[in-house]
Amino acid sequence: MKRLSLVTTNRLSPQGNFLPLCTFPLAVDMAALFQEASSCPVCSDYLEKPMSLECGCTVCLKCINSLQKEPHGEDLLCCCCSMVSQRNKIRPNRQLERLVSHIKELEPKLKKILQMNPRMRKFQVDMTLDADTANNFLLISDDLRSVRSGLITQNRQDLAERFDVSVCILGSPRFTCGRHYWEVDVGTSTEWDLGVCRESVHCKGKIQLTTELGFWTVSLRDGSRLSASTVPLTFLLVDRKLQRVGIFLDMGMQNVSFFDAESGSHVYTFRSVSAEEPLRPFLAPSIPPNGDQGVLSICPLMNSGTTDAPVRPGEAK
């Protein structure tokens, strides 16, 4: 079995004011700009006493030594653009330091703006697992809603759409348009991958979860390291361990957002998600013996809200 490769709060209130779904992408863009401007590319935390390199990039003062080309040397290699700066030519960036201070003050408001809108659940999909795509080491429940990794191959039929090396599975239905929402219970699992992918992704051989290859996923490793499948990886910070993940796909706006479905907190949003071909739900549980054999379960429908009519695999687009 092969591990998938990764390339290197307040509760919801029905009476609260939530961001309209149509303006959510704009808020995400704003939050992303704030995060990019205030984050250190070395430690991924807020910039602390930011120092500007000769190339114009900025890092924390405490992270400067990690850029040394040689121990105790004066040359600093930028981790963003690979340009070399002289230690005696770096300067404090006071203006950016003040900006970061303001952004830290605004963080609670940004979190509230990006909180999950309960109306997203109107678009909940009656989803099942597509057994024809399942890797042979995956054990699937009879109702096609839960999956975990096993130690013994299931000797399923060798199909063109089946993942033969990477231990993962696709969900059904496929999506060609509209808005769609679903939740996955990850329980206490310490490793998992969830999201969407192009229907045409390569399923033979070891796969890499990257947006460039058609995977828009959030992954958990070692019980605490959460990341998005951007290139390079975007490491994510959450207030608490995720146990139920909400995924909202908006084909029209070309974005997919991830939430802590229990608290409503925003986790991450991919923008510019390709809508040129159908997308499929993607799931990958942990792998024993290093993994914990955690179960991923698709949560049942919570209401009978309307959804855009999905297209099942094999049906005409």
UniProtKB/Swiss-Prot annotation:
Residues 107-301 form the B30.2/SPRY domain. A zinc finger (RING-type) spans 40-82. Gene3D superfamilies: 2.60.120.920, Zinc/RING finger domain, C3HC4 (zinc finger) (3.30.40.10). GO terms for biological process: innate immune response; regulation of gene expression. GO terms for molecular function: ubiquitin protein ligase activity; zinc ion binding. Expressed during neurogenesis in differentiating human embryonic stem cells and in the developing human neocortex. GO terms for cellular component: cytoplasm; nucleus. It is found in: Cytoplasm; Nucleus. InterPro entries: B30.2/SPRY, B30.2/SPRY_sf, Butyrophylin_SPRY, ConA-like_dom_sf, PRY, RDM_domain_RFPL, SPRY/PRY_RFPL, SPRY_dom. (Microbial infection) Stimulates the activity of Human Immunodeficiency Virus 1/HIV-1 pre-integration complex. This is Ret finger protein-like 3.
